[in-house]
């Protein structure tokens, strides 16, 4: 949906008394990449936050690959945007992240988290983690534990690896 279409829909809801808007997607930060308008998710959030009214904006889920300083700065700038971020890291091991085809590494993830916490000291940070990924070593598992301990998440959703139908890893036998 275009920025104008999204903004009009949300404006109608707010004028109707809605107090909380949640933008939901597998990777909300990729908003606009398929549009020719030159706008991204941070621009959409800013446009919504400028709509008159008393409401709160939430969103999930963000992909670390597309989470940008611009997004975090936008969140920090507008009081109507909840200082809450679900940013799945999946593994603390760069090798495992590469095997998962996640398109970021441990250091990049930590840089993004540190920046987000710097510009939003009251940030509520949640994440997802998968353990038992095929080929994950004990040392790589420990890298995941150390990342968890260093970030201090407010909430963490933990999963044991399970192959998903239609994916390359669905062909393996565990």
Region locations from a protein language model:
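Structured C-terminal cores of nucleic-acid metabolism proteins
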Residues: 137-172
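Single conserved hydrophobic/aromatic residue that forms the stacking wall/gate
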Residues: 1-5, 9-10, 172-173
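Conserved SAM/AdoMet-binding glycine-rich loop
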Residues: 15-138, 149
């Amino acid at each position: 949906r275009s920025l104008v279409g999204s903004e009009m829909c949300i404006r109608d809801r707010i004028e109707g008394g809605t107090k909380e808007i949640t933008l939901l997607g597998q990777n909300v930060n990729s908003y606009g990449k398929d549009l020719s308008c030159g706008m991204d998710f941070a621009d959409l959030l800013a446009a919504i936050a400028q709509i008159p009214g008393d409401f709160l904006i939430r969103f999930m889920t963000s992909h670390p690959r597309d989470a940008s300083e611009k997004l975090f700065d936008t969140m920090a700038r507008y009081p109507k945007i909840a200082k809450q971020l679900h940013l799945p890291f999946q593994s603390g091991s760069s090798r495992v992240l590469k095997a998962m085809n996640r398109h970021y590494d441990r250091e990049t993830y930590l840089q993004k988290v540190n920046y987000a916490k710097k510009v939003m000291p009251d940030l509520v940070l949640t994440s997802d983690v998968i353990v038992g990924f095929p080929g994950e070593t004990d040392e790589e598992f420990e890298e995941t534990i150390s990342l968890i301990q260093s970030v201090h998440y407010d909430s963490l959703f933990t999963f044991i690896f399970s192959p998903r139908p239609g994916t390359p890893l669905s062909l393996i036998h565990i």
